[in-house]
């Protein structure tokens, strides 16, 4: 098997960043200090095309109904339980569930009974100043 060093394959239209990322979610979550309320969020991958955040909605948190005009959001539940507003209806989510929300679609996330751990993947990247339009 051939191995390639970071940055070896150049000449792409957009080749930033020039290194890959591997995240151990168990270690990540174990090392985070959660707020008493709200959402803990850390950007773990950032490029012009995509942004990935590892997040925890703390028990009792409702993010708030909103939509995005520029980017689509993919939410991957990786731990705990919660609910996501999908097409106007609250749906239960647990580890292994994936919610794909195109731009312009109203959605929300809440963690009522326990913390909800999830990934948010935005494509394209969230613009400067954010793309959250609250309702």
Annotate the PLM regions.
Residues 88-103:
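Short acidic-glycine-tyrosine-enriched beta hairpin
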Residues 56-58, 67-84:
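Short, conserved beta-strand element in jelly-roll/cupin
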Residues 1-51, 64, 134-135:
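A short, N-terminal "cap"/entry segment at the start of jelly-roll beta-barrel domains
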Residues 48-50, 58-61, 81, 90, ...:
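Short, charged/polar surface micro-motifs in flexible loops or helix N-caps
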Residues 81-83, 90, 106, 115:
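Structural motif
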Residues 103-129:
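Ligand-binding loop in jelly-roll beta-barrel domains
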């Amino acid at each position: 098997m051939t191995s390639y060093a970071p940055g070896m394959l150049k000449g792409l239209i957009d080749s930033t960043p020039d290194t890959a990322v591997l995240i151990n979610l168990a270690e990540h979550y174990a090392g985070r200090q959660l707020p008493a309320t709200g959402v803990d969020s850390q950007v773990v991958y950032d490029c012009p095309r995509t942004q990935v955040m590892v997040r925890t909605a703390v028990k009792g948190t409702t993010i708030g109904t909103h939509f995005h005009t520029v980017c689509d959001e993919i939410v991957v539940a990786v731990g705990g339980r919660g609910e996501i507003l999908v097409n106007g209806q609250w749906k239960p989510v647990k580890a292994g569930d994936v919610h794909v929300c195109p731009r312009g679609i109203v959605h929300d996330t809440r963690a009522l009974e326990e913390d909800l751990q999830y990934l948010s993947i935005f494509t394209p990247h969230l613009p400067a100043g954010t793309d959250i339009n609250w309702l």
